[in-house]
Amino acid sequence: SWDWQVFCKDTIDGEIVPRCFGGAGDVTYLDWLLSAWGWTLSVSLLALGVALVLGSIMGILRTAPHRGWVLLGNAWTELFRNVPLLVQIFLWYHVVPALIPPLRGVPSFILVVLGLGLFTSARISEQVRAGIQSLTGGQRMAGLAMGFTLPQTYRYVLLPMAFRIVIPPLTSESMNIVKNSAVAFAVSISELTLFALQAQEETARGIEIYLAV
């Protein structure tokens, strides 16, 4: 039988806590679950912000008329898209701080946000590029003919139409980034995956734990 009171138990002594929320230093599994949700959403939202900014910039560069910018955007996209996410997280956590000493004091939370954000930026770059290239060439020429500079043409003509086209895949990507945030458990960030793994080991109530997650 299911035992939903598992979330009202103290994580130390296993005693049931009234009203399921710990106090005076006590932490219940419900407290832990809510904290894990907070970590997951924090990682996901911050990484999504990083990915949207960098991905949009790289997507624009890949459609620019200058070959150097195109090469930079393509190199960025291919690098971060083709290296597995878990490998990138380990590189940011173990290798990059060793190569750049000032980063040794950076919290693992920030490093995971950067790793997940850069990985997702490559995917968003591809979507933004496809959205811009789906527009007819006359849109760019019309903007330039009206006296806009190239940056103004992108800002006022191309990007508003392109982003309307790529809203569906961007919505899908925002859901993917929440799922991908599970890799944070590999560097001991107490998000939902780490909570589920540890809580089921301590309580032997895997079904209830994973249904709540």
Task: Identify the meaning behind each predicted range.
Residues 1-213:
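Transmembrane alpha-helices and adjacent helix-loop boundaries
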